[in-house]
Amino acid sequence: MAAMASFDWADPLGLDEQLNDEERMIRDAARGFAQSVLQPRVIDDFAAEADASELFPLMGEAGLLGVTVPEEYGGAGASYVSYGLVAREIERVDSGYRSMASVQSSLVMY
């Protein structure tokens, strides 16, 4: 009988081993921001139906907006995988915050 494959509930798709060092660094920074800045306020923002526009400068300072925009235009010049990782970490807290970041990151490209 074959041995059972191990399963990692924290990383069920084995994503972490597929990331390069830069992608891990960006993911970890996004996770830190999401947990320290977004998580503490999400329930109050949701209850107040607040737009939380004061988060845009904070997200920008943290490098979470325009992740794929080239550095010469003020972005990080990172990969689309990195952008997806940032979105995933923000989404982990709230889809509304992720929508805010995604829209702003997309609008800057045009």
Task: State where each predicted segment sits.
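Short secondary-structure junction/hinge motifs that connect adjacent elements
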Residues: 40-61
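Internal helix-loop-helix
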Residues: 61-110
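A structural motif shared across PLP-dependent enzymes of the aminotransferase-like
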Residues: 27, 50-54, 75-83
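A generic secondary-structure micro-motif detector
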Residues: 20, 44-46, 76
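Residue-level recognition of alpha-helical structural elements
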Residues: 19, 48-52, 97
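Intrinsic disorder at enzyme termini
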Residues: 1-22
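Generic non-transmembrane alpha-helical segments
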Residues: 32-37, 58, 62, 89
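Mature N-terminal segment immediately following signal peptide/propeptide cleavage
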Residues: 18-37
